Amino acid sequence: MVSSNLALQLEVTTQPKIEVQESPVKWCSVSLSDVVSRGIRLEASVFDVEAKQAREKISKGIYGTVALAGDNGLIETAYYPGWIQRSRLKRIYCDREYGEGFYLPSQMTDIYPKPEKYISRLADCDMDELRLKKNTLLLTRSGTIGSVAYVSKTLDRCVFSDDVIRITFKEQYDLGYVYAFLKSKVGNLILRTNGYGSVITHIEPGHLEEIPVPNAPIELRKRVNDLIVRSYALRDE
């Protein structure tokens, strides 16, 4: 009797319900021309869904878009040392007393950057071309691409490698405005991908012509720029 009751209890015992949390499906539409341009490849990895959605958000925004670079773009100049000559910087490292402090691209966002190495003044390169200039926007073009920094008092005249793109703008107020956009999740995602949404491993100045930026009113751009400039001024103190 006891054994039969035990068997009955085991039989009617409810099994614990296991809930599987499903990840939301990521999707986007892809034009036929994009598919053809990508070698008629249909793998999802070829088209970064979030990157394409980011571009769609910008294109459908209330302000419309303007190109970051190009004839009608916001940028005046975008270059890195040796870009025109297509040559790499030849570095000669030395002790502190014989050279210039040399900063790594990863240090351009540091609050108190200190040179990791020293480059000899005898190196076959234009040292002035390597020095950063105040009121310039910086982008890392290789390695960890897409890092963005603003050259204020702290970085002014510091020597950085050719792995950093230097950018100036036609209108000064666009400096802080574009900085804020490229630091945002949407802006940085667009910066690190191409027009098809694929992640790129290297940024050249020409890539900036493919970057859409919200064409906000000038007064809003000026306000954003002023806030960025003030924030960096406080960091410099």
State where each predicted segment sits.
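Short, contiguous, well-structured surface segments enriched in hydrophobic/aromatic residues
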Residues: 97-102
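Non-catalytic DNA-recognition/assembly elements of restriction-modification systems
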Residues: 1-91, 217-237
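Short, Lys/Arg- and Gly-enriched loop/turn segments at beta-strand edges
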Residues: 145-152
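Basic, amphipathic alpha-helical recognition segments used for DNA target recognition
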Residues: 1-17, 109, 134, 153-157, ...
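A generic "binding-loop/recognition-motif" signal
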Residues: 144, 163
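Sequence-specific dsDNA recognition surfaces
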Residues: 70-91, 106-134
